């Protein structure tokens, strides 16, 4: 109604560089999200029956559509261990239960009060039968070719980090092995800075999040005046509603920028 148009698969074309793309418009908004999986960095993550959270959830959604998904990950009658403590981990917990998993554990290296997932999601997961393993640090996924168990070490919490969260410290000689059929890695996601960021004056912080020019009068403007950004690639993994809110604010910033430029 307001004259917007959408073009998919444009960025996959090799004949359009970002420089050329940028020169085609008065301003560009980057909302590329955080889609790089965070790994645990321990042995066994590449075994069969170990799944990253997003492909697992996506395969389940696609399988509910009219055409069944050839890559559908079905955990019916399986004993599942979900590693992680955010909302994505909660989604994996409850999806596995709805698929008919025999047992679902959710292991997190801190205690419940330090869990990043929403309290409501944790409460709902408990009510549906998820067994939480608090203060448990995974150190190895065990198996020959496929996952058969996860080795954990107990943790205790010490001083807080820069974000105010207590730091888990492994308790010596506290090893525990829990058998399973499948493991889901739900450690969260991180940004994936592109090679063309630097040459276009798009600066990032130490973990790859795009930096916004906080002294600019235009909301969500980067150090390149034509480029705006928001959502997960600026603040880190968060909720869809937060990204939508920042997108709206950035749109207002872009309108103000273009109007001032054309005066």
Regions found by a protein language model. Give the residues of each.
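Phosphate/diphosphate-binding loops
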Residues: 134-140
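A conserved FAD-binding loop/helix module that cradles the flavin
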Residues: 233-258
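Glycine-/small-residue-rich beta->alpha transition segments that form the dinucleotide
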Residues: 27, 31-38, 86, 180-193
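Active-site-proximal substrate-binding core of FAD-dependent oxidoreductases
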Residues: 115, 255-263
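Rossmann-like NAD(P)H-binding beta-loop-alpha module
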Residues: 66-101
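Single conserved hydrophobic/aromatic residue that forms the stacking wall/gate
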Residues: 1-11
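Conserved beta-strand-loop-beta-strand element in the redox core of flavoprotein oxidoreductases
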Residues: 13-25, 144-175
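FAD-site-proximal beta/loop scaffold in flavoenzymes
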Residues: 46-77, 161-237
């Amino acid at each position: 109604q307001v004259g917007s148009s959408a073009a998919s698969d444009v960025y996959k074309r090799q004949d359009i560089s970002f420089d050329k793309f940028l020169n085609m418009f008065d301003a560009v908004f980057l909302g590329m999200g955080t889609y790089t999986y965070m790994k645990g960095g321990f042995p066994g993550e590449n075994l069969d029956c170990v799944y990253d959270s997003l492909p697992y959830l996506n395969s389940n959604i696609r399988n509910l559509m009219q055409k069944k998904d050839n890559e559908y990950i079905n955990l019916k009658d399986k004993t599942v261990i979900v590693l992680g403590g955010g909302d994505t981990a909660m989604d994996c917990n409850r999806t596995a239960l709805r698929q008919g998993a025999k047992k679902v554990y959710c292991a997190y290296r801190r205690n419940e009060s330090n869990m990043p997932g929403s309290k409501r999601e944790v409460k709902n997961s408990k009510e549906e039968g998820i067994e939480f393993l608090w203060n448990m640090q995974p150190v190895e996924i065990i198996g020959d070719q496929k996952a058969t168990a996860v080795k954990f070490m107990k943790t205790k919490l010490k001083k807080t980090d820069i974000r105010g969260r207590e730091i888990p410290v492994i308790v010596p000689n506290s090893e525990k092995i829990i058998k399973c059929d499948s493991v889901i890695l739900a450690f969260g996601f991180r940004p994936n800075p592109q090679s063309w960021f630097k040459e276009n004056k798009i600066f990032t912080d130490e973990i790859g999040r795009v930096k916004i020019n906080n002294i600019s009068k235009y909301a969500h403007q980067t150090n390149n005046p034509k480029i705006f950004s928001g959502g997960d690639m600026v603040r880190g993994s968060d909720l869809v509603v937060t990204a939508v809110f920042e997108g709206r604010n950035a749109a207002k910033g872009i309108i103000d920028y273009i109007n001032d430029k054309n005066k």
